[in-house]
Structures are given as C-alpha cells and as structure tokens.
Amino acid sequence: MYIYCRFLTNEDLDEFNKLNAVRGIYIHSDMTTYNLDTGSYTCKRLFSSSTSSTLSDTRDEFWLDMPRFHNESYEYFACVKFTTNVLSIDDLGEIFSQKISPKTKSVRFPKREPKNRYLRVIGGDNPQYPIYVVSRGRYDEKCAKTVKELNMMNVPHFVVVEPDEYDLYKNSFDSLGYTYSEVLKLDMSYKDNYDTLDDRGDTVGKGPGGARNFCWDDSIRRGFSHHWVLDDNIEWFRYFTDNFQRKMRTAVCFKASEDFFTRFKNVAMGSLCYTMFLDSKDKAYPFVMNTRMYSIIFIRNDTPYRWRGRYNEDTILSLDCLSNGLCTIQMCAFSADKITTQRVKGGNTDMFYSVEGTDNKSQMLVDVYPQFAQKVFKFNRIHHYVDYSVFNMQLEYRDDFTTDNLDKINDYGMRLVNIPKEWDRTYKDSREYIESHLDECEEVDMFNIPL
C-alpha cells in the first residue's frame, strides 16, 4: 500500500516528525519516498533542468471586465510517497493523524480543517440565455443532480424528458419543491430522425443528441440567439481564483461566461471546465481555447451544425466547429463537479455504457474524425485521444464590441459567506435562504482564504 503525504510548510513537517518520533520515523524535505516497514528512503536529484516555458500568453489580455482570476503555482514544502506491506489501516491512521481507508492514496498533513467546506458564493444576476437540462431516468432527488443544484442556486431552467417519463419528472419535482424547473416533453421526432452515424438503428439507445437538437430549436423558437445545454449529473458549480475553488450559490458562473463568449464573432461554443481537471496548486489561465466542449455547453444558435452521433456527440460537434475555422472556449475561472460517466443510474449509463463499456464510444469518434482522433487504453478502459493542437485560430471581437473604458475586474456582485455547518446540503444551503439570513452567516474576504 502507498500513500502520498504533502506538507505545506516546514512547521507541518516538524509536527509530523514529533508525532512519529516514538516510531523512529524522521522525514526531511528532500525525501521523495519512505518505506515505513524498513525505514529506507530515496531523495530528490541534486540537479534538474528547467522545463518552464518562456512563451508569452495573450489570454489575460482578453480577460477584461470579468471576475478576478489569479492562480500562480506553488510548491509543497515536501511531498513523500510512504509505502508499507505490514502496517494496518489503524496504524496508518495514527501515523498521519487522520482517518485512512484502503482506498486512500493521498493526504495532507496536518489534515486540512473543514471550515472552507461551508463557504458559498452568493449575489449577482441570472443568465440572459435559457438553460436546458437533458435528462433520462433521473427524476428522483438522489439522481437529479444538476436540477437540484440549479434550484439551490435559484436559476430558472428547462428539463427536457421523453413523454413517457414526463409525469414521473413533473410529480417528483413538484413534491421536491423544485419551482425553478420547467419540465418539457421532448418532440420524439428529434430522436427518431437523429443521425446516429451508424447502422444500428434502435437496437441500442441513441444518446442525448436528439434531445439536444430539440433544445437548440426550442431556444430559437423562443427568440434567443444562444442557449445552454447541461448534463443532468452535475453536483456543484465553482468559482476558481487565488488557488481555491469556491462553491457557488449564484448563477454568475453562467452570466459572466456567456458575457465573455458572446464578445467574439468567431466563437461557436463555450463550456465550463470540470473541477477535477483544475489543480489548485498549479498556475492556470481563466480559459482554454479551441478544445472539446462538454457537459455544461453554451452554443451560438446560428452555428451551421447540429448534434450527431450515437456516442461522443459533444466531441464530434466541437470538431465540426473547430475543423471549419470556428473557435471554442472552455472556462477555467468557473467549473463544475461532474459525476463520472458510469457512476449514476439513468442517462447514457442505462442506455449503453453499463452494457457495452466505452469501446464503441471511442471507435465512433475515430471513424468520424480519423485525422484528429485515436483510441488509447488507460485507467483500465478504452478512451479516445484527440490532438487539438492543430487548431490555432485566434479570438476576434465582434465589430460592435470595444474594450475602451472597460475595467479590468468586474465581480458581478459576488460575495463570499461562511454558512453554519448544519446548513450544509440542506434546504437552508440555497441562495434564497442564505441571502435572507445573512445575519446568521459570516462574510469572508473572497480573495484571502487560507489554503
């Protein structure tokens, strides 16, 4: 068994050594591995060559009149891989002074205090453009992750479901008090006529693409030039800056993002990044250009393409846009906690992934775009790999947009508060309740949070 342990300061390392002196364990900052059974260890190399890039980056120049974004890399004072074939879980718990399980792979010493767990971003406005959540078989509170979050954030949205599940969704959401959710019946002709890009017909599920095309056209019928379409398995939305991810109880993540995306005449799609892809200790930029859009997607309605493909339809649509000279933007300043593809019952999991795995999914993308995609095996299953480096288009402002007189920072009315821990994940952990009970919360400096 192995566990990586990170120490932020020299004082943390000294505390660890004092705690474990009786065991004969002594760690210094140059160590990289330590065998708890034998006391043997390895150290860092004395010399290393720098691999840091000296190339300039222009993304910050575009980040005007937007929320603060500043993430510089920082190093832990020490990071050591501890190994053992002898010690028990209880022994390890005593050594690291925290709960350890057989699945534990990484800890920080001392254990991080949970106080930041109850920080919430509030304030600001709702988005200008409609939000659609495409859902299937996820109408109860446990599975309707995105819908629950949007209600806790007080964000109006549409939930698109197949007609045979309409009553299940409507009754469930009514009983849960999800007043911000409007359930729409999918026009099944969108599913029947959907281009799956294969010859398997109705023998397996067709995926969410047909419903997403319905959302696209529905937003046009309602008079909108853009729309959002979200997966139904999002647990949190976050604001990332100063090396910390803040949980949001506001829709500023959508409002600020759409304001940014629509500044440019050659941006067809935007999305929010997955939180799990953003390392809080690494240098980061507020957005990434010309890559795949997924799960929390913003689309310009006059884009001359539509969803297609039984699998990997998000990557296919992204490549449709990119290969024809249009840009995409993935936000890093705002992110979403996405439940992994095959962990939640319903949706595509019940359609095919739980039966087929992911091989067919990856193969379809390779068949459609062989010049960009290939299949690889990693993390114990088949994945696809796409080389996005060939897409180097630059952002172009709309002709009627000017940066004159723009401030560098626009906080969009966001505030940060620390809620009582007993409110966490209850009905009180909602924007409406928090903002009406601010006297019971502690206001916190948004940009001065102990890491």
Language-model features: where?
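Compositionally biased, non-globular sequence tracts
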Residues: M1-G124
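C-terminal catalytic/acceptor-binding lobe
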Residues: G124-P130, R138-E141, G309, T315-L451
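Short, aromatic/basic amphipathic alpha-helical patches
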Residues: E15-V22, D91-Q98, K145-L150, L168-T179, ...
